Amino acid sequence: MSTNQIILTDQGNNYVNVWSHVAQDLYNHYGETLYNSWFSKVNFIESSLNTVILCAPTNFVRDWIKSKYSMVILQLFQHYNNTIKSIEIITKELPGTTQTVTELPTKTFADIGSSELNSENIFSTLDVRFTFDNFVVGAPNELAYAAARAVAESSGAVSESNPLFLYGGVGLGKTHLMHAIGWYIKQHNPSRKVIYMSAEKFMYQFVKALRNKEVISFKEKFRSVDVLMIDDIQFICGKDSTQEEFFHTFNTLIDNNRQMVISCDRSPSDLDNIEDRIKSRLGWGLVADVHSTTYELRLGILESKIEQMNVKIPKDVIDFLASKIVSNVRELEGALNKVIAHSNFTLKEITLENTQNILRDLLRSNERIITVEDIQKKVASRYNIKLSDMSSSRRLREVARPRQIAMYLSKALTPKSLADIGKKFGKKDHTTVMHAIKKVEELLENDIELREEIHLLMKILQN
């Protein structure tokens, strides 16, 4: 037998064991329904030249797993054995060499007792997709990314960003960065004790410790770690006992030069129903805002995701998704997955028209409601005039022209009548608004610079 080909030798058996662990991780992360649909009938075949070969039951399952999950499976294998460089999925089994993982214990994170949560099993709480390598950096998140990276690379020392407080809307990358910190430390400093969990689970385990009279054990566990990461800290707002425990845990860790990373949907100063002493401490280190995505960042995220999934998507479809799915990264990636899944299931080509039909309901919910007030603020800012000038009767050209442009955009981008628009501009009548719109339309016929300016304003307002 060639030394490069391993078919259930001792090392081969080790690969079988690794596949068992990988399958368990897939089950824990994706849940029973999805696991049973895609992974339960996948077999380990062999390993050859640092490539793991798996067998899927059908061509369809093989193609679906390859397009959507191959990178995840490879990263999981590499976590347990870093000599593995690639995976191959086939549909023809080799006799006598398979290991099927169909029945798995149903133990999930919720079943992990307090004594089990330590640096050895942080992996079970981390998403393999969320690493620094696949985090797309842009202007809205570059500070948060740099700070998270500094925390991860601190090599046992506490970073200057302690605590690191990440805040921003849903699906913008806060959790991704926290998982990335955990992965980096796990891979480069495995001796460091790290805990990552949501504030809800922190509360759940605290209540459980109170009920089981294990509070001392709870305190020792959380106050002896090197890095504590708590996601969605806003969950403890209004929960006095949990806040008290968190406060003392926070103080102990900071006093002992241990790193804390916290995420929230708002800044510390905007938190309600939380003690001032906690609010103050949350702002001690670096507070980094993760802003809403820009078109350029969304484009980068889509291109990165498409490359990872090894699929081909027409450029006009990518541009369409980046322009229309503006709420958050989670919805953007979900829309892309839906388009790819529809194509795989129906065997239809991915086209702009098909994409628009597939995402019709999602696009409707993502349509941004633009108000006259939004337009006034944006135009006033663009032309460096006071917002109050929008409602004034000043006839100076540097004031009147932006006001006319704002009226034009209000008619183009909102469902308001001319009379309603006039009311927003200092109770002007509909004929004044009509005159302003007509004036701008006349200028647009010959003024290329103005045409580009209004096009830019429209794009900014819509995105």
Swiss-Prot record:
Species this chain originates from: Rickettsia africae (strain ESF-5)
Name the chain's protein.
Chromosomal replication initiator protein DnaA
GO MF terms held by the record: ATP binding; ATP hydrolysis activity; DNA replication origin binding; lipid binding
Q: How does it assemble?
A: Oligomerizes as a right-handed, spiral filament on DNA at oriC.
Q: What is its main location?
A: cytoplasm
GO CC terms in record:
cytoplasm; plasma membrane
Recorded hits in NCBIfam families, A to Z, give:
DnaA
Give the UniProt record's GO annotations in the biological process aspect.
DNA replication initiation; regulation of DNA replication
